[in-house]
């Protein structure tokens, strides 16, 4: 998988996994604020960005991540949305490499029956949406600041029916790391939908050593809305597993 690195490799490493339909640039400003203290690595997940040639499956993606973890040794992992779902499964499979993790806006496994309906009736819509329309819809829907328009426009070039179906399929294969020893912070934006908030409650109910928190006034992709706060939340959790004072405990 394609990756971008920032910061001194002698420092502790944080692996960043972006949301569906985005790419590594989602984390650019967050990484900038963390790079003095951490070695930051943002990947392009399969069928996204510069990893568009790699098939997107849960098994394949987590295997790629396992190789990346082994390369760096002990790592922290941060994932948003699709990236958060993959983080959960990676934590289940490769807990020995993960010192701590932060996930945001993540759902747990979707039912196969529901995904069949989504793949039949929702995914084909992406066949007729032009990239420039997708950019506009994403920026408006996620309240992404205008300074990110170029990055969103590039990411939207990869969005198609096959990618969307692959993402839906991946979300049927999430494995919860129930016997978890790595501190896990499960975050949701205050403006997230109920599906995400129910998943947040389910994850923290079943996964040991996990904690939930709400980000006030934040939406789904709040790494764009407030990269400084996102960086501070990550830093506090990675260093001493404390929840940022701005967040509301659940």
Language-model features: locations:
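Flexible "cap/lid" loop of the alpha/beta hydrolase fold
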Residues: 88-93, 97-128
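Catalytic histidine-centered segment of alpha/beta-hydrolase-like enzymes
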Residues: 218-231
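Conserved serine/cysteine hydrolase catalytic core
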Residues: 166-205, 211-214
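Conserved alpha/beta-hydrolase catalytic His-Asp/Glu region
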Residues: 112-114, 128-179
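Conserved HGGG/HGGXW glycine-rich cap/lid loop of the alpha/beta-hydrolase fold
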Residues: 5-50
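Active-site loop/oxyanion-hole signature of alpha/beta-hydrolase fold enzymes
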Residues: 28, 32, 41-78, 232
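Alpha/beta-hydrolase fold catalytic core
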Residues: 1-15, 35-39, 70, 143, ...
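Gly/Ala-rich beta-loop-alpha elbow adjacent to hydrolase catalytic centers
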Residues: 79-83, 87
């Amino acid at each position: 998988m394609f990756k971008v690195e920032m910061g001194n490799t002698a420092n502790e490493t944080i692996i960043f996994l972006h949301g569906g339909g985005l790419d590594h640039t989602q984390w650019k400003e967050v990484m900038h604020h963390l790079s003095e203290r951490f070695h930051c690595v943002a990947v392009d997940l399969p069928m996204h960005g510069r990893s568009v040639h790699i098939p997107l499956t849960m098994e394949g993606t987590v295997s790629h991540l396992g190789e990346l973890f082994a390369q760096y040794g002990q790592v922290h992992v941060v994932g948003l949305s699709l990236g958060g779902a993959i983080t959960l499964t990676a934590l289940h499979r490769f807990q020995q490499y993960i010192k701590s993790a932060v996930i945001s806006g993540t759902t747990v496994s979707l039912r196969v029956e529901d995904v069949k309906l989504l793949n039949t009736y929702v995914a084909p819509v992406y066949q007729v949406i032009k990239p420039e329309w997708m950019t506009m819809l994403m920026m408006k829907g996620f309240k992404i600041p205008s300074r990110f328009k170029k990055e969103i426009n590039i990411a939207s070039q990869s969005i198609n029916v096959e990618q969307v179906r692959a993402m839906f399929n991946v979300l049927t294969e999430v494995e919860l790391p129930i016997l978890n020893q790595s501190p896990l912070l499960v975050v949701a934006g205050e403006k997230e939908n109920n599906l995400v908030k129910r998943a947040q409650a389910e994850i923290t109910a079943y996964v040991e050593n996990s904690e939930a928190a709400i980000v006030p006034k934040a939406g789904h992709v709040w790494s764009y809305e407030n990269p400084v706060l996102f960086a501070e939340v990550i830093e506090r959790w990675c260093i001493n597993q404390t929840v940022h004072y701005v967040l509301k405990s659940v």
